[in-house]
Amino acid sequence: TIKISFECSDDLFIAEPYNILIYRWIKELLTNVYKHSNGKRAWIILSVERKLLKLTVCDNGTPTMSTNTLGMGKNTKHKGLSSIREQVEKLGGSFALSNNFPQGFRIEIEIVMNGGNSYQYFIS
């Protein structure tokens, strides 16, 4: 069992199709925490400031996993994190993976929500 804390403002609004992406990314990131981190806690922080959407997911698990274990290496059958990174980069965003002091991992994603541009082809 993993205890999950979720933090966002009461009036948070995420436009389509970004809401679907965020849902899928959170689902994949929490699945990774459950399967690979050996942690007992996960924290999700979601915010939007002037069209900049920020998603942070961290855990208190094992901080010394390799990139292959994390699904970021080339020689791995696990593609979850590398898939998220690719999607974020296609949207012109940033994806950062780091240690979560004192233990665990932290993933930070930032993307700009463009109201006029449609990325629906990207979600399908």
Task: Give the positions of each predicted feature.
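Conserved transmitter core of two-component histidine kinases
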Residues: 2-9, 45, 95-98
